[in-house]
UniProtKB/Swiss-Prot annotation:
A single Gene Ontology CC term: mitochondrial inner membrane
Protein name: Solute carrier family 25 member 33
Cellular location(s): Mitochondrion inner membrane
Predominant subcellular localization, coarse grouping: mitochondrion
Similarity-based family: Belongs to the mitochondrial carrier (TC 2.A.29) family.
Pfam families in the cross-refs: Mito_carr
Induction: By INS or IGF1 through the PI-3 kinase/mTOR pathway.
Length: 321
């Protein structure tokens, strides 16, 4: 049985490992997050494309011109940002992201580890129900604490300025939100974040199941030394990527709703009202705008975060024992 000192040491270890993993992942995948947020926004510029309608019965063969709006894809948005705003705009929101991601991941993993200890004493140890309740509890606490920082980050990512013009920094953006919307403005999109807990639960339930399978796999048990560590590390990366990919596809619509709720001067007021309005005005496909960018960002990001976390825990636990 762990003593009070050992439990405190374990909590600090999970805080540190989670913070390091989150920071590394945020830096590497920031440009993709900016593109994803732009794609999710209702302010995404639509290109009007004109398709000629051909009438065979006319002498000229040409008829009316029919305008059709086309939503730009990932590469069009990337090209637009580079041409109009410059490469620095691909790192918009990195400041609040770095300020928030380390404590966010640290709080999440510490809460997750602590909750798992508690739920293991109530349910069958390390069962799926333990992972589900632990992930849900950790996500709820983390979302409640960190929403103001993510709100500022989203606003900064949505700000579009031409190349060379001055953009708001993190403190200026936070001050502007407070002056125009008050304290409540920092909690816009929180209901959508709570809905997104389902994604976290799905992700960790799949991840823990895959991790358990990898530990019991014949290849893992037959390997030894460096080979075993290498196999485990890359296995965890693959498990993290797969679990996040599945979870993102299932629960993605809440991300679009959250971005809409965080837009400045928005017509979107609540989670349900936003969902109805987006569906009525843009159709169900609008709920999946930016999914491709999300997948190619989140899958490597989650793999980096979880594998860095597991690696640091493994290395430091060995040294403290």
């Amino acid at each position: 049985m762990a003593t009070g000192g050992q439990q405190k040491e374990n909590t600090l270890l999970h805080l540190f490992a989670g913070g390091c993993g989150g920071t590394v992942g945020a830096i590497f995948t920031c440009p993709l997050e900016v593109i994803k947020t732009r794609l999710q926004s209702s302010r995404l510029a639509l290109r009007t494309v004109y398709y000629p309608q051909v009438h065979l019965g006319t002498i000229s063969g040409a008829g009316m011109v029919r305008p059709t709006s086309v939503t730009p894809g990932l590469f069009q948005v990337l090209k637009s940002i580079l041409e109009k705003e410059g490469p620095k705009s691909l790192f918009r929101g990195l400041g609040p992201n770095l300020v928030g991601v380390a404590p966010s991941r640290a709080v999440y993993f510490a809460c997750y580890s602590k909750a798992k200890e508690q739920f293991n004493g109530i349910f069958v140890p390390n069962s799926n129900i333990v992972h589900i309740f632990s992930a849900g509890s950790a996500a709820f606490i983390t979302n409640s604490l960190m929403n103001p920082i993510w709100m500022v980050k989203t606003r900064m990512q949505l700000e579009q300025k031409v190349r060379g013009s001055k953009q708001m920094n993190t403190l200026q953006c936070a001050r502007y939100v407070y002056q125009t919307e008050g304290i409540r403005g920092f909690y816009r999109g929180l209901t959508a974040s709570y809905a997104g807990i389902s994604e976290t639960i799905i992700c960790f339930a799949i991840y823990e199941s895959l991790k358990k399978y990898l530990k019991e796999a014949p290849l893992a048990s037959s390997a030894n030394g460096t080979e075993k560590n290498s196999t485990s590390f890359f296995g965890l990366m693959a498990a993290a990527a797969l679990s996040k990919g599945c979870a993102s596809c299932i629960a993605y619509p809440h991300e679009v709703i959250r971005t809409r709720l965080r837009e400045e001067g928005t017509k979107y007021k609540s989670f349900v009202q936003t969902a109805r309005l987006v569906f009525r005005e843009e159709g169900y496909l609008a709920f999946y705008r930016g999914l491709f960018a999300q997948l190619i960002r989140q899958i490597p990001n989650t793999a980096i975060v979880l594998s860095t976390y597991e690696l640091i825990v493994y290395l430091l636990e060995d040294r403290t024992q």
